[in-house]
Amino acid sequence: MDDQRPKNIFLLCRDSGISFDDLRLHCIFCAKVLTTAELSAFALRELNVVWRTGAPYGACARCLLLQGIVRRLKHWDYSLYVEGVEEETKQSIDTQQVRCYMCHKPLVKEEKDRHRNERRRLHCIAGYWRGSCQYCWLRCTVRIPQ
């Protein structure tokens, strides 16, 4: 039965006959209704809809950030440079799915290349490779004036 349920927001809208603007999803973590901006961000991050008791759920921005922090703290395994990840997995980083450990967006080629070129490590968290997207990279490297 789970295989027949829509896995993303676009398929959910199509299969249920509800327009994106009329879609209302609750957050799986805090149960609040996602705003239109949060629904858009959820879709753009290519996150899957979660099904509980026959109902679809998403995740709000605040809970996604919090869950990323919790997962990083509880489930961080180790970190490697891009070359180390490629050596360990026997695959080019370009063919692997790597998500941002902060916002969960899949990294695009340019973001993966930036990790390689600027010698930034990727992190194995709960068995999956994670890095920083462009937005979170800038957010994490902001210098606070003294």
Swiss-Prot record:
It comes from the Viruses. It is found in: Host cytoplasm; Host nucleus. A zinc finger (unnamed) spans 27-63, 100-136. InterPro entries: E6 (IPR001334), E6_sf (IPR038575). Disulfide bonds: none annotated. Keywords: Activator, DNA-binding, Early protein, Host cytoplasm, Host nucleus, Host-virus interaction, Inhibition of host innate immune response by virus, Metal-binding, Modulation of host cell apoptosis by virus, Transcription, Transcription regulation, Viral immunoevasion, Zinc, Zinc-finger. GO terms for molecular function: DNA binding; zinc ion binding. GO terms for cellular component: host cell cytoplasm; host cell nucleus. GO terms for biological process: DNA-templated transcription; regulation of DNA-templated transcription; symbiont-mediated perturbation of host apoptosis; symbiont-mediated perturbation of host ubiquitin-like protein modification; symbiont-mediated suppression of host innate immune response; symbiont-mediated suppression of host type I interferon-mediated signaling pathway. Pfam families: E6. The keyword Zinc applies. Belongs to the low risk human alphapapillomavirus family. The cancer-causing human papillomavirus E6 protein has a unique carboxy terminal PDZ domain containing substrate but low risk E6s do not possess this domain. Belongs to the papillomaviridae E6 protein family. Plays a major role in the induction and maintenance of cellular transformation. E6 associates with host UBE3A/E6-AP ubiquitin-protein ligase and modulates its activity. Sequesters tumor suppressor TP53 in the host cytoplasm and modulates its activity by interacting with host EP300 that results in the reduction of TP53 acetylation and activation. In turn, apoptosis induced by DNA damage is inhibited. E6 also protects host keratinocytes from apoptosis by mediating the degradation of host BAK1. May also inhibit host immune response. Forms homodimers. Interacts with ubiquitin-protein ligase UBE3A/E6-AP; this interaction stimulates UBE3A ubiquitin activity. Interacts with host TP53 and EP300; this interaction inhibits TP53 activity. This is Protein E6. The lineage of its organism: Viruses, Monodnaviria, Shotokuvirae, Cossaviricota, Papovaviricetes.
